[in-house]
Swiss-Prot record:
HAMAP family: Reverse_gyrase
Domain Toprim, residue spans: 580-743
The protein, known as: Reverse gyrase
GN (gene name): rgy
Reactions listed under catalytic activity: ATP + H2O = ADP + phosphate + H(+)
Domain Topo IA-type catalytic: 759-1157
Pfam families, sorted: DEAD, Topoisom_bac, Toprim, zf_Rg
GO MF annotations, alphabetized: ATP binding; ATP hydrolysis activity; DNA binding; DNA topoisomerase type II (double strand cut, ATP-hydrolyzing) activity; reverse gyrase activity; zinc ion binding
Induction (free text): Transcribed at least during mid-log phase, seems to be a monocistronic operon.
Domain comment (free text): Introduction of positive supercoils requires the cooperation of both domains. The helicase-like domain probably does not directly unwind DNA, but more likely acts by driving ATP-dependent conformational changes within the whole enzyme. A beta hairpin in the 'latch' region of the N-terminal domain plays a regulatory role in the enzyme, repressing topoisomerase activity in the absence of ATP and preventing the enzyme from acting as an ATP-independent relaxing enzyme; it also helps to coordinate nucleotide hydrolysis by the ATPase domain with the supercoiling activity of the topoisomerase domain.
Functional description taken from the UniProt entry: Modifies the topological state of DNA by introducing positive supercoils in an ATP-dependent process. Increases the linking number in steps of +1. In vitro requires high concentrations to supercoil negatively supercoiled DNA, relaxes plasmid DNA first; DNA single-strand binding protein (SSB) from S.solfataricus strain P2 stimulates positive supercoiling. SSB stimulates DNA-binding by reverse gyrase, and thus all subsequent steps. Binds to single-stranded DNA, transiently cleaves and then rejoins the ends, introducing a positive supercoil in the process.
């Protein structure tokens, strides 16, 4: 039996505790030796029961904090119910938990979900030292009345620290000096846009929050330093130290400011003061999230507004911005002439009050994202339909827009400017580099960073080329898939559809009412067919079920009835189940990718860890999720002196591996797992600990309904999930494991629909592998260090046989050194080896011409290769591009985390029905559907891995086009190699789903001289089928006498091993796994045992490596031979399948090591 132990991790006393206890939500045995009667009770009751038992036994310590939080939550929930008359629902509970935990954050939910009610109830709960800020005086009066109704002592229109003070932004700005000494406990902002837009208002808010001016100025200085020096040649150690000082000063003060909660915002902070506030509060005001749409989207190809006569009262007309204010007035008059009361919705709130009271039938406003008509109307009962007078558009002067490198690239390619040299430089820009280039071009400033300054000069040159080309084109309107370029008067404009304004504006007609979403009706009066088609395409990408129907196909009478029915008290509305959760992934990139995939997430930074809040909609189920990265493993086997290298083996046969939190030294970048805040390698105290992540995850887990652990779908990922579940179980009992093999919306939704339990068999397999690695590695490394009197020695079961292969080939290569003649015949290489220079020279002198005869030829069928597995991808990338395995794995990891390919650690060639459909879609649009041959390649159990394939039907050119159109879509920084590897994966997969090709196999007799005849059987032609996307090498040799290309050099008759050779051997001999191919070679390089040749990436053993291997193989052959290693790998697989006992295998390994190693240790001379 294996009993996993965690060092210093008891939630009560901080002592050692077993995983079993943590998973059951219990303290350690020292705190509670015996426990009965709590099985089967809910989490809150369990916490209370355990608290009382600990208290009765005088053992209560840190568990008091958990009990306090739980009971405080209960208190505020009860208070909420007493005040409002109903239980807070899931999302309100999340907000209330955050509020009583003193967190600052944004409530990024649509109107109708109880944001204002929650904020008001919490304000009353606090009772005093509360400042509630609203944008207008009329709203202030409404809030005051509601607060008084809830029982608050209210100060309406001025600040009184003994009460709940409700004030306007205007009051804050005018009376800032009189309230400088006042620091409230809690500040609520109903609409943050006024603060975000105005630097002056930000100054006033900073003062109100109790942030000293010097700290505020430090935050501003920090942002300026980062902006100025990040890409500068002057980014010296002195500047870095100054940045560190400022960061420390801000961090020390963060917990001392007032709690700030923002109920809504529609824009993001851009000014330096607003960014400083974000830095100080730890969160960014985010736009209101779009939870779902319940809208009928329609269009008509004219600007006829007479449809109003049939739809009647309750409409909003949004006029495209280019028509100007005068057209709004004309439309208002037209509506009034039809017999309706109309009013302009341009500013203030009077128009909305009149509309709500039924005094106004139709509102007319501007189709502007920041306009009150688009974002300021919330009338679920009155507003039923929205008419867009003209397609909503964004229009900018083209020459100004060209300062954006990506816009320049797209426009230039559209009009035929050759960007081949510049394209790769632009595509690999980071967002901050692109921004810096953009602003330096606009301002005409140079960049104090040579690489970017050179690129700026190139961009200016290409801008001039684009301008000249446009002058040649003249008046013609240019249309692309994503924008239109038009000349109006003397200026060129670039025009895009304004999809966000369409979504926000049409969303005014579909609001939450009585727990459901009303039906809305949207009509676009199309004034530009090209822009409308682009809008349709973008909408369908974001909402695949979107379908714009021609108004001529709509029964308006039926629609009008449905709209009215939807607004009745018991009407037919779309209802939702909203639940809150914590989604834990391994990497920050993956967290960002998933969060961005479903919505525009809000971000809070807690203890330097970004927490993304995203909305995931799955039909009527809505998840409000905090997405956080664990950054891989949080624990590792302890380095403390416990048992045999951190593992105790008790007489009863129980094995206790002790795990400690992983810490990372930020100076030497090494990780360690001991209970010390000092790096054991370099002595630095600049150490980062996983405890920070665990504390944050516990805090977040306590606030949500469920926890979803989504670490990678392999044994390492399962162990990470097991550890996370252990640490979080005392704080939330609803913990689930979810897995996915690709980061796509469909895969994430499927995973959330099918939560699982942690697979303990996979966990045990990983534990055995890690313990075996620790025992073998530490034991042999220590012997190597003793033998060779040096550091940085290492050994392991897999590393040692691999080192042996490289050592063997290196020795043979060196012993067979001589001279080599390289002969090239029309691309076909021949290599001849000679032991002596003289013989080589004689051979060359006799080699004037080569005679070639074709002696046989036949037609053959060529079958496509299966899609890539980890080993075949590494082999192919090395053979084609000479890339080392660790670099290919890093790139594949990036592509996976960006959601572009399926999981890259796999030994399966299976392709799912989803993958087959992707191939069909791509081949269809490329006109290659006749070559489509669906293949699953191998059977696969449910949930098993797939081969490595793309997640969408876009090739590398389409991917590049996507990045040009939306450079910030993906959360990784692309390089040329990312495109190379993606292209390789994509084409190999597509080929695997295509028909056979027809090839010609030719046999040639190549006569080099009298004695050297070579029979070469070569593929001389290949065409059709999969060859169209994945060409193969062909040799079409000329016949007769040919003068060859000849080169000479020193060389060997023996071939060194390449990365691809080693990976092939690991696979064929059964000692490699998808997770170990690259790591094994990387470790051998790190220990200085092998080096890689620069030109051809051959692996060569060093003298150090040869000595280490000869010692290990002579003393421990039975421990590290490839046969023994292969058997162990097989046993690990059997443990994962529950065919073998993990503890039995570990005891065998321990016995094996003891038998071989202990006698050697006792020898005098190791």
């Amino acid at each position: 039996m294996i009993n996993v132990m965690y060092k210093n991790s008891c939630p009560n006393c901080g002592g050692d505790i077993s995983a079993d206890r943590l998973l059951n939500g219990l303290p350690c045995e020292t705190c509670l030796p015996y426990i009965n009667g709590i099985d089967g009770i809910d989490h809150i009751s369990k916490v209370k029961a355990l608290y009382n038992i600990l208290l009765d036994n005088d053992k209560i310590k840190n568990y008091w904090n958990l009990y306090y939080n739980i009971t405080t939550f209960e208190t505020v929930f009860k208070y909420f119910k007493d005040k409002t008359g109903y239980e807070p629902w899931s999302l309100q509970k999340l907000w209330l938990r955050r509020l009583v935990s003193n967190q600052s954050f944004t409530m990024s939910a649509p109107t109708g979900l109880g944001k204002t009610t929650t904020l008001m109830t919490y304000s009353v709960f606090i009772g005093q030292d509360v400042v509630y800020i609203v944008p207008t005086k009329s709203l202030m009066e409404q809030v005051c009345k509601r607060l008084e109704k809830l029982g608050a002592q209210v100060s309406c229109g001025k600040v009184d620290q003994r009460k709940v003070s409700v004030i306007t932004i205007s009051y804050l700005n005018k009376n800032a000096d009189s309230i400088t000494s006042y620091k409230p406990n809690f500040v609520a902002i109903d609409d943050a846009d006024a603060v975000i837009k105005s630097g002056k208002t930000t100054d006033r808010l900073v003062s109100l929050l109790g942030i000293p001016n010097d700290v505020y100025e430090s935050a501003i200085q920090l942002i300026r330093l980062r902006n100025k020096y990040y890409f500068s040649n002057e980014f010296t150690e002195e500047i870095k130290e100054k940045i560190r000082e400022l960061e420390l000063k801000i961090a020390e003060f963060k917990d001392k400011i007032s709690q700030l909660v923002i109920a809504s915002a529609t824009i993001r902070p851009k000014g330096i003061k607003q960014k400083a506030l974000r830095l100080l509060t730890g969160f960014e005001p985010s736009s209101i999230q779009l939870y779902a749409r319940n809208i009928i989207d329609t269009y008509t190809d004219n600007l006829d507004l007479s449809i109003i006569k049939e739809l009647g009262s309750g409409g909003l007309i949004l006029v495209s911005k280019e028509y100007g204010r005068s057209r709004l007035n004309e439309i208002k008059k037209y509506v009034e002439d039809l017999g309706f009361n109309a009013k302009l919705a341009i500013s203030g709130r009077k128009f909305l009050d009149d509309f709500s009271q039924g005094k106004v039938d139709i509102l007319v406003g501007s189709a502007s994202y920041y306009g009150v008509a688009v974002r300021g109307i919330d009338e679920p009962k009155r507003l039923k339909y929205v008419i867009y007078y003209g397609v909503p558009k964004i229009k900018a002067k083209l020459f100004d827009a060209l300062s954006n490198p990506f816009t320049l690239l797209r426009v230039g390619k559209m009009i035929g400017v050759n960007f081949s040299e510049l394209q790769n430089k632009i595509l690999v820009l980071s967002p901050s580099e692109a921004q810096l280039l953009k602003f330096s071009i606009i301002k005409g400033e140079t960049i104090n960073y040579q690489k970017l300054e050179q690129l700026r000069q190139e961009l200016l040159y290409y801008i001039s080329l684009v301008k000249d080309k446009l002058k040649e084109i003249g008046e013609e309107t240019l249309i692309s898939d994503n924008f239109v370029i038009a000349k109006q008067n003397t200026n060129y404009y670039i025009i895009y559809p304004d999809m966000i304004t369409y979504l926000q504006g049409s969303g005014r007609a579909s609001r939450l009412y009585n727990g459901g979403l009303t039906l809305g009706f949207s009509i676009i009066l199309v004034d530009d067919k090209h822009i409308f088609e682009i809008l349709k395409k973008k909408m369908q990408k974001l909402f695949p079920n979107t379908n714009f129907t021609s108004l001529s196909n709509i029964n308006l009478s039926e629609i009008k009835t449905k709209l009215e029915e939807s607004r009745k008290e018991e009407g037919n509305r779309v209802h939702f189940n909203i639940s809150t959760g914590l989604l834990i992934v391994e990497s920050p990139t993956k967290a960002k990718t998933i969060a961005k995939m479903f919505s525009r997430p809000s971000v809070r930074v807690i203890n330097k860890v970004p927490v993304y809040e995203t909305i995931i909609v799955d039909g009527n189920q809505i998840y409000v999720l905090d997405v956080v990265a664990s950054k891989g493993h949080i624990v590792d086997l302890t380095l403390e002196d416990i048992g045999y290298y951190g593992i105790k083996i008790e007489y009863s046969g129980i094995i206790k591996p002790y795990y400690d939190l992983i810490k990372k030294c930020l100076d030497c970048n090494k990780t360690f797992s001991i209970a010390s805040d000092k790096c054991p390698y370099c002595g630095s105290t600049n150490v980062q600990t996983a405890q920070t992540t665990i504390n944050l995850l516990r805090e977040l887990a306590l606030s949500v309904d469920k926890v979803f652990i989504a670490s990678d779908p392999d044994t390492e990922g399962e162990k990470i999930a097991y550890d996370l579940a252990s640490f979080l179980s005392p704080y939330n009992s609803n913990i689930y494991r979810i897995t996915y093999h690709e980061i796509t919306k469909k895969a994430i939704l499927e995973a959330l629909r099918n939560p699982m339990k942690i697979n303990t068999n996979l966990v045990m397999s990983q534990i055995v592998r890690r313990i075996e690695d620790r025992w073998i590695g530490f034991t042999l490394s220590n012997l190597l260090k003793t033998k060779f009197n040096g550091h940085n020695h290492g050994a392991g079961r897999v590393q040692t046989p691999v080192l042996g292969w490289i050592v063997d080939k290196t020795i043979k290569y060196k012993s067979a050194m001589g001279y080599v003649v390289y002969i090239d015949i029309a691309g076909y290489p021949i290599k001849m080896h000679f032991s002596e220079r003289k013989k080589m020279e004689e051979y060359i002198n006799n080699l004037q011409v080569v005679k070639i005869e074709k002696i046989f030829e036949e037609k053959i069928l060529l079958s496509p290769l299966p899609p890539f597995t980890t080993d075949t991808l590494l082999i192919e990338a090395n053979m084609k591009y000479k890339l080392p395995a660790n670099l290919v794995m890093k790139i594949a990891q990036d592509l996976f985390e960006a959601g572009l390919i399926t999981y890259h650690r796999t030994d399966s060639t299976h392709i799912s029905s989803v993958g087959i459909e992707i191939a069909k879609e791509y081949l269809q649009k490329q006109g290659l559907i006749k070559d489509f041959v669906p293949r699953s390649w191998e059977s696969s159990e449910e949930g098993a891995h797939e081969a490595i394939r793309p997640t969408r039907a876009i090739d590398v050119n389409e991917l590049i086009q996507e990045i040009e159109e939306n450079p910030y879509k993906y959360s990784i920084r692309f390089s040329k190699l990312h495109f190379l590897i993606y292209d390789l994966i994509f084409r190999r997969f597509m080929a695997s789903q295509m028909s056979h090709a027809v090839g010609t196999k030719s046999r040639y007799l190549i006569k080099l001289n009298k004695n050297d005849n070579i029979n070469a059987e070569l593929l001389s032609n290949a065409e059709g089928g999969f060859i169209k996307v994945y060409p193969v090498k062909v040799y079409n040799l000329p016949l007769g006498e040919v003068k060859p290309k000849v080169n000479t050099g020193k060389g060997s008759s023996e071939q060194l091993l390449s990365y691809s050779d080693v990976i092939s051997l690991m696979k064929s001999k059964g000692i490699g796994r998808p997770s170990t191919y690259a790591k094994t070679i990387e470790n051998l390089v790190r220990h200085g045992y092998i080096v890689s040749s620069k030109r051809k990436s051959y692996l060569i053993a060093t003298n150090r490596g040869i000595s280490a291997y000869q010692f290990l193989s002579s003393k421990f052959y039975d421990l590290v031979s490839e046969g023994t290693t292969a058997k162990l790998m097989s046993k690990l697989d059997d443990i994962a399948l529950s065919k073998l006992s993990a503890s039995t295998v570990l005891l065998e390994i321990f016995s094996e090591i003891s038998t071989l190693v202990n006698p050697l240790k006792s020898e005098q001379n190791v």
